[in-house]
């Protein structure tokens, strides 16, 4: 029996001719990632190993993004601790506040991840880089520490679900709507410890930003990773962002999948995830008329330039409804600057939105948009668990930038076609 795309990447990095689902393997790592929340714990564990250097100064990336710019003294102390460790170890890819971004927007932009890589990160949404044809997955701080010390980690080889995406999506259907539809269909544990492998002619209509969004949310279906085949769009992106060499892996024709699911993208509608799980989805025609207090457009899921362009296209020349807070967070400094140069920021501010420096911020209930008791938020983020963005009696509705921007104008969940 042949191997899936994920299995081929893992076999190569384990120095094996082949692997099969359920097999325990040790692999060599191309990149180890941490942030301001998870890295301090990893540093503490690293110090217990009795080693005095990291395995490779250029293959570790540390991105303070959750509570930065520092929201309080505790956050400042954590970042200081991480900064001092990075300086001591000579880690080349520590991103200070002036050059930082939300980690999963920043690393592809900086060209640190390429097709064929194996990447681990002490953040659950590390699966984002599957959009580039890499195997990437979230791990805990202890595994991050071991990865920094040895350049290796172990995996149980995942089985896979193949998603065959067909046809062209309708006007307002984005990668966010597609992945919400999939999560709603299979459930938050529907791909538990499985590779979600996306194929089909529908990929021709999905931008790289759409793919980043979809791979990012693979974990919300329980997936070990989400991954896309490398095509012309991938290669164009890689050529623009990196000088690193990449390697293309393709699934064998006789690869074995636990399930094969076909999805006709032309039949999908804008989709909203209701509280308090990402799989509690409804199409926009069954989701409207829910009154809201706040809108957040940003995050590692939807903070890229195309997302801001979509929001601008809906909000330009209009006004955010009085009493509604509309918070826009570009994913990186580069995206922020590009949005400034394109006049996007000006149009958003004139519409009544507030624009933040890059940060995870409100997504995890950290800062820059926390919800009070009883408040509701339409957010382009990736999780809507109880208390995720603030008070345990607040509510988060996950949606695309188009739905979020339209909702900011009306003060209720709104189909972008209607504004």
From Swiss-Prot:
Pathway: Amino-acid biosynthesis; L-leucine biosynthesis; L-leucine from 3-methyl-2-oxobutanoate: step 2/4. The keyword Lyase applies. Binds 1 [4Fe-4S] cluster per subunit. GO terms for biological process: L-leucine biosynthetic process. The keyword Repeat does not apply. PROSITE patterns: ACONITASE_1 (PS00450), ACONITASE_2 (PS01244). One of its GO terms (molecular function) is 3-isopropylmalate dehydratase activity. It catalyses: (2R,3S)-3-isopropylmalate = (2S)-2-isopropylmalate. Gene3D superfamilies: Aconitase, domain 3 (3.30.499.10). Pfam families: Aconitase. Its cofactor is [4Fe-4S] cluster. It comes from the Bacteria. Its EC number is 4.2.1.33. InterPro entries: Acnase/IPM_dHydase_lsu_aba_1/3, Acoase/IPM_deHydtase_lsu_aba, Aconitase_4Fe-4S_BS, Aconitase_4Fe-4S_dom, HAcnase/IPMdehydase_lsu_prok, Homoacnase/IPMdehydase_lsu, IPM_dehydratase_rel_enz, IPMI_cat. Keywords: 4Fe-4S, Amino-acid biosynthesis, Branched-chain amino acid biosynthesis, Iron, Iron-sulfur, Leucine biosynthesis, Lyase, Metal-binding. [4Fe-4S] cluster binds at residues 300, 360, 363. Catalyzes the isomerization between 2-isopropylmalate and 3-isopropylmalate, via the formation of 2-isopropylmaleate. PANTHER family: 3-ISOPROPYLMALATE DEHYDRATASE LARGE SUBUNIT 2, HOMOACONITASE, MITOCHONDRIAL-RELATED. Belongs to the aconitase/IPM isomerase family. LeuC type 2 subfamily. Heterodimer of LeuC and LeuD. This is 3-isopropylmalate dehydratase large subunit. It comes from Clostridium botulinum (strain Alaska E43 / Type E3). The gene is leuC.
